[in-house]
């Protein structure tokens, strides 16, 4: 039996997510420490450049559906991978802090073309019956991007230097994505004479981007507003906690054990996303997301109230189970609630809103930590935001 071509697209999207999240999301956080340590630049300045990287990317993501329609998904992905690699090289080659903001323009554009909106656009046309499984598998690359490339980058830069390490890893990664894009993203369902796996033909799939709901109208729709608000609050809380997790745990566990806790959380994110992808079926995506957030809140409570290693591990496990699902549940909810012609635009716009929002999360929690001389209140805020996110999502369900 011939393997359905869509699964090759899924694994290509997985590879794009590994590369995109590694150099677009995780490694900038590592550079915050490395550039501060090596160059003596202020944490505030480097953090501002990272926020600029995220905000610029968010602005581009808003128009990703039109960009893909105009230039082709495979071309945009290939060019984005090259830009992300060049941007990363610009970050580590900077000799003055202002140059980070120039590098962020390039890296932000590359991250926009290799992040969640792009992964969704790759997978969406190929699946219907197994869409949840396909999207979950593809988005697992986002977690792997933090598990493998980041430790490798940190080790390699210590062995051969910051610039050579970036040149090797980013160069190899970009070359791989360019090749995979040409091989597996260039063909389309129409060019191969195929239909979405497990689904009948649907004329709506062929409609143009111009026929979709205007953004101004989307911003007035309850289903969109509650979906965007819920995931923006949830991801603000999640990114904020993850960015501070080592600093939170190191005083009681030590750096090595804190690192293992982060790894455990990431592994649980992969497990949680994979299991949900195979089992979610036709369940209400908003209810599942709210339950996902409730489990994470229990984990946050444990992290806020204990210093016992075993209980901290339980807290990281519970929080980690939901980490990956937040990224993949949003596209699945959009697929369930919007017409096929609108999904790409809806997903891109929500991802842009999410990214613009969570770009301020690390700094906001840092400010709260400094103001309260500890992590108790930052964790209270994280838990409260997750509960508000769940309520926002459920309120949208009632209004449908």
For the regions a protein language model found, what residue spans apply to each?
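Intracellular juxtamembrane helix-capping segments at the cytosolic ends
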Residues: 113-127, 325-338
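Conserved MFS/SLC helix-loop-helix module at the cytosolic interface between two early adjacent transmembrane helices
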Residues: 59-97
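C-terminal transmembrane helical hairpin of 12-TM major facilitator-type secondary transporters
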Residues: 265-269, 275, 282-333
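Helix-loop-helix hairpin linking two adjacent transmembrane segments in secondary transporters
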Residues: 142-189
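Extracytoplasmic gate region of multi-pass secondary transporters
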Residues: 28-32, 219-271
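Helix-to-loop junctions at the C-terminal end of transmembrane segments
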Residues: 60-72, 273-284, 369
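Interfacial helix-cap and linker-helix signal at transmembrane-aqueous boundaries
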Residues: 35-36, 67-68, 148, 152-160, ...
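Extracytoplasmic
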Residues: 8-43, 64, 150, 241-246
């Amino acid at each position: 039996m011939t393997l359905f071509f869509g699964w090759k697209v899924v694994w290509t999207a997985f590879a794009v997510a590994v590369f995109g999240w590694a150099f677009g999301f995780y490694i900038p956080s590592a550079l915050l420490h490395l550039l501060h340590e090596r160059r003596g630049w202020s944490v505030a300045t480097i953090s501002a450049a990272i926020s600029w990287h995220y905000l610029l990317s968010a602005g581009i993501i808003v128009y990703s559906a039109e960009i893909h329609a105009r230039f082709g998904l495979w071309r945009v992905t290939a060019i984005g991978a090259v830009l992300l690699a060049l941007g990363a090289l610009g970050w580590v080659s900077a000799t003055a802090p202002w140059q980070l903001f120039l590098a962020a323009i390039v890296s932000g554009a590359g991250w926009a073309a290799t992040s969640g909106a792009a992964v969704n656009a790759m997978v969406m046309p190929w699946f219907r019956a197994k869409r949840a499984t396909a999207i979950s598998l593809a988005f697992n690359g986002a977690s792997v991007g933090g598990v493998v490339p980041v430790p490798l980058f940190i080790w390699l830069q210590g062995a051969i230097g910051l610039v050579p390490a970036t040149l090797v890893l980013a160069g190899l990664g970009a070359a791989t994505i360019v090749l995979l894009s040409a091989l597996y993203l260039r063909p389309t369902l129409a060019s191969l004479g195929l239909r979405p796996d497990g689904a009948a033909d649907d004329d709506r799939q062929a409609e143009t981007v111009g026929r979709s709901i205007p953004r101004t109208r989307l911003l007035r729709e309850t289903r969109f507003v509650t979906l965007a608000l819920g995931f923006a609050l949830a991801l603000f809380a999640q990114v904020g906690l993850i960015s501070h997790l080592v600093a939170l745990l190191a005083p009681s566990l030590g750096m090595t054990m804190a690192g293992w806790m982060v790894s455990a959380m990431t592994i649980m994110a992969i497990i949680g996303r994979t299991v949900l992808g195979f089992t979610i079926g036709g369940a209400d995506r908003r209810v599942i997301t709210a339950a996902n957030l409730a489990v994470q809140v229990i984990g946050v409570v444990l992290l806020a109230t204990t210093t016992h290693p075993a209980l901290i591990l339980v807290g990281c496990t519970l929080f980690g189970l939901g980490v990956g699902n937040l990224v993949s549940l949003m596209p699945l909810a959009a697929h369930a609630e919007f017409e096929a012609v609108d999904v790409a635009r809806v997903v891109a716009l929500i991802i842009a809103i999410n990214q613009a929002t969570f770009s301020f999360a690390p700094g906001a929690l840092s400010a709260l930590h400094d103001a309260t001389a500890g992590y108790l209140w930052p964790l209270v805020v994280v838990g409260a935001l997750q509960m508000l996110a769940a309520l926002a999502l459920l309120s949208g369900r009632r209004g449908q």
